[in-house]
A protein has these predicted regions:
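Active-site beta->alpha loop and helix N-cap motifs at the rims of alpha/beta catalytic domains
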Residues: 3-145, 261
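Alpha-helical structural signal in soluble globular domains
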Residues: 63, 67-72, 96, 100, ...
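Secondary-structure boundary/capping signal
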Residues: 76-77, 133, 162, 185, ...
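Catalytic alpha/beta core domains of metabolic enzymes, predominantly
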Residues: 139-241, 245-249
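Positions that flank functional sites
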Residues: 51, 86, 112-113, 140-141, ...
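Structured C-terminal cap/extension of enzyme domains
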Residues: 199-308
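General structural feature for long, well-ordered alpha-helical segments within catalytic domains
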Residues: 25-28, 32, 60, 64, ...
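Short, flexible micro-motifs
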Residues: 12, 46, 51-54, 84, ...
């Protein structure tokens, strides 16, 4: 059964870098790790929906996992995504991640599963490993709703004590889960690109797991809020909201983020595998204008100054 965790803060969901021939680019994985650690994040989360896990074969999945974990060298925890069509496959992926040195796994639900099946699924995955298992609750992408009652039961009876919660209205669901489970049985991370990060913290979330490509902004919001400077956290959130909103666009969010990371020098190519929508020249122009409007740069290397 997984050990308890005190995880909190900003966990960046990482893209999987490919070269221009669409092969996994391990050198860009290493440079991305170094870049992200410089922004002050708490941890890395790999092979999530943003990481194009569903577009990798098994050998590539293991290569990506091993490269991220080995290059991170324990400087921050690395959480690994699990997504399978059945319990057996999910257990295999979770155990492989554990063997590679993952600090936790975050598991997508089974397709269109009942409450009973979801409970059995997550409990089985948790029972197969000694590292924490995180529920990935994103019904808009996975097509499966995980009700607060199921989440609470998993926290109390299933050995699963964390959730990446991405079902709007996020505030109401966070409060409902906390009411049913309590803060010790279920720790809640937000997501959805950081669009509701301030409200998630106000409702009791312990952090966020998202792929926003300026993670130093989220780190500043979290640090101010955790220090009791709630007005300062709100001021930072309000300043950068236009960029958070623009970057988290359905269908092109991955392409926008890979473009930003390439421009910032974190990865060598912004290539994405099919299926996946690319961005046109006008979209790039809009993005760069939005970045400039909030006082950031798409080309400056390394951590950028974040202001209220």
């Amino acid at each position: 059964m997984p050990a308890p965790t005190n995880a909190k803060g900003v966990f960046t969901i990482c893209p999987t870098p490919f070269d221009d021939a669409l092969k996994v680019d391990t050198e860009s994985i290493k440079s991305l790790v170094d870049f992200l650690l410089d922004t002050g994040i708490t941890g890395l989360a790999i092979l999530g929906f943003l990481g194009e896990l569903h577009k990798l074969n098994n050998a590539e999945r293991r290569l990506v996992t091993d490269t991220f974990i080995q290059h991170t060298k324990g400087r921050v925890p690395v959480w690994v995504g699990v997504r399978a069509h059945g319990i057996t496959g999910a257990i295999e992926q979770a155990q492989e991640a554990q063997d590679s040195g993952a600090a936790a796994v975050f598991a997508a639900p089974l397709d269109n599963a009942s409450d009973a099946l979801l409970f059995d699924y997550y409990k089985a995955v948790a029972g197969s490993v000694k590292i924490p298992v995180v529920i990935h609750d994103f019904p808009d992408s996975f097509g499966t709703e995980i009700r607060p009652e199921v989440v609470a039961r998993l926290g109390k009876e299933g050995g699963v004590n964390m959730i990446k919660m991405e079902e709007p209205p996020v505030g109401q669901k966070i409060s409902r889960i906390r009411d049913l489970a309590g803060d010790e049985a279920m720790k809640i991370f937000g997501g959805l690109g950081g669009m509701f990060f301030l409200e998630e913290l106000q409702r009791g979330a312990v952090g966020t797991m998202t792929g926003f490509a300026y993670p130093e902004v989220l780190v500043e919001i979290y640090n101010r809020f955790a220090a009791g400077d709630h007005k300062g956290a709100a001021a930072v959130f309000d300043r950068y909201c236009p960029l958070i909103r623009y970057e988290f666009q359905p269908k092109i969010g991955l392409a926008l983020r890979k473009y930003i990371y390439q421009q910032r020098g974190a990865i060598r190519s912004n290539a994405i595998r099919s299926p996946g929508m690319r961005i046109d020249a006008l979209t790039i122009k809009e993005l760069e204008a939005t970045v400039a409007r909030v006082g950031l740069s798409t080309t400056a290397r390394g951590r950028q100054a974040v202001k209220a």
